[in-house]
């Protein structure tokens, strides 16, 4: 290479050093000073990884004094270039020697990098283009936010999330029956709102005991990192901000914390976008005396735009409390309880009409009259004729039924604010088969009970009952650790024999306390060497994950998982179908929670519930109350909470020492009250609401599309290539999983979310659902999003030179492939990406400036190309400069035309969709007061904002590939 003192060169391997100056040429070595960093580098003159920096007419260069020069011509003297042109500040003609160029110059634009010889590898150009296409594909999907979470594709859950998650500031009550996944629905909505930019700050309020469960659920299922706030955390955060709630975007806290006026005032002032309240049915309210908890949530709901309330079945705790929760969502709409009751009575006609439309039979005259009256502002006669016709296509009839049903849903009832699915309306649940195993009471327990009675001491009825239900705990209190209750308890003998006879089955065992769980594991291990693992509240999240993964492993995994009551909260093990209840909880809700670990939608097998119990004890009496009084083992019992509240005192007396007559009397009264409550709930079912809540065929269509996305092998290939190019180590672990680890040769110093010890991932949803320790990789996963951002946010792949070996074309034929990005800068919350997401525009020019992109697709063209090394590529670019400059101008013309078309289409789509939705909601508002004025105002403002953003749309050159034909 010809070097001269004062020449400006750039390092091909360390471009961050800026512009270098040749300061010494001696023998076969050259020394370059990089003034921006003050560093020297010495190179061999023949093999220096350096590129000469020479600008061309039309370029703008900056002097070391800060002023710019628009280059008109350049001359050379003694090996140094002198630039001549117009001074940016004075407008005068001036000259600037290259020695006086700004040292801090960076070649960020692709064309600058190309001419500076900063040429990237061929595969990096390809991955950059693929990344831009993936980002565009994700942004344009109307299912954005639904694919990424690690949840089963359950139609009613996806339907509710799809409907609610797309709204501006949704305010809804999620009231599905137990086991139908309210937490998942809330998580899906939160995930959608965050991913689409509709929300940025979220506050979740839960009971104390559920804070950890929500933290785990949000992280494991939705990749959302919430922070748990308690009083200690608030004090600690005060060092960073006067208002501790401003130190995090996503917060979980308990109602107890917010009962304190100081903390509530801070929460009210924290600008939340979305408020989520779990167990909202415990917020007590009467018109005269609302509870403190209710007042806390009411105050927050008045200042937070979006509110999700998660509650038990609305009728479970009475109609007045149901009204109170609706009042939190929209106090203007639900202002008077009596008016609400009167309106609810009018829904009965709507429900009857809806049920008729939802079936297949012809409509009765009464149903037709009812529909005509309910939809009086619309001519429904043509639809009725279609439904009643004899010889007509069934699909047309179904479409007519669906249309009228949608009209009813839009105009009547609480369908926009309340979603409630029941097991009666959602299919796919397994049977619950109950098996009880009586055993004689061990003498050791009887002795411990007598000693305890002699020692006396006043205890509450509840404490006495709890003691009677767990005799092993009482025994252990009187013995030292060398005397283990599990050595003589017949339930342990039974458990060992049961596991030995079901060796091929996974068995979940639940006991009330961690000590009991640990003792059972010790018994199984020491007596029979049975592989079991424990799961209790004293373990960290990582330890629980490992235990869950060990249990889930098909080969070499644990046969049994032994959980404590609290430790099992929030964890589901649908892959198992045998549940052993080693003891019974006193609360029916806790019993349902235990069974709910297996009895979830998505469970493939019938659930076998096994209960070993001690005869003639409190255990047997409680078993009878649950089984004969509530039928709580074989069916869910939504009224369990109410029944326990009503019969708690009688039940506790029976457990502590009641006789047979008292037990019989209790069972009779419980059965009678159970039937009353069940009948009332059946009568209260709102068929119209159920139809709206489960989504029908529309919900199934959403799930089918998501399932197809899961099978997208192109996505899997693109993501694997992305990690390959970044330099992420990938180890095939088997069982559809890969371990990702950072390597020493990664393209970027850090990869956020990829820990030093690695992360196990899978592209298979079923695998991820069965293993808590394996992440589900989709386009929405942070590891994929981060990878896309790392590539597209850097210079990676912005320039490339390739050879096309094709003897049908003359050698030396040049092609210039340009990738432009059409974009409009706007906040994510504006939703502009729905109409004009960042869109890659590909232009493929021949040397005459003709665009061949429509005739030559990217994939087939890319497969024919061969890479060239950087030095040869740089020489080819230098030799081709006279041809390239006019081609760039031509390429921009083609791209600008494409952008103009995209903007016009985006404007038309935006106007059509938002105007249509606005017109629909405005017309509905006249007949359905559930349409909030805020939603209408939001749509009007959004149309104006989006139009302004579209006017400011821009075109940016993102990547360049120069291709030359060779016959060698």
From Swiss-Prot:
Enzyme Commission code(s) on record: 3.6.4.-
Binding positions (ATP): 176-183
Broad class of enzyme this protein falls into: hydrolase
Keywords carried by this UniProt record: Activator, ATP-binding, DNA-binding, Helicase, Hydrolase, Nucleotide-binding, Transcription, Transcription regulation
GO annotation terms (biological process): regulation of DNA-templated transcription
Source species, domain of life: Bacteria
Domain called Helicase ATP-binding: residue spans: 163-332
Motif residue range(s): DEAH box: 278-281
One MF annotation (Gene Ontology) recorded for this entry: hydrolase activity, acting on acid anhydrides
Helicase C-terminal domain location: 491-655
Disulfide bond annotation, renumbered to this chain: none
Function: Transcription regulator that activates transcription by stimulating RNA polymerase (RNAP) recycling in case of stress conditions such as supercoiled DNA or high salt concentrations. Probably acts by releasing the RNAP, when it is trapped or immobilized on tightly supercoiled DNA. Does not activate transcription on linear DNA. Probably not involved in DNA repair.
The protein's assembly and partners: Interacts with the RNAP. Has a higher affinity for the core RNAP than for the holoenzyme. Its ATPase activity is stimulated by binding to RNAP.
Family note: Belongs to the SNF2/RAD54 helicase family. RapA subfamily.
Name of the protein this chain belongs to: RNA polymerase-associated protein RapA
Protein source organism: Shewanella sp. (strain ANA-3)
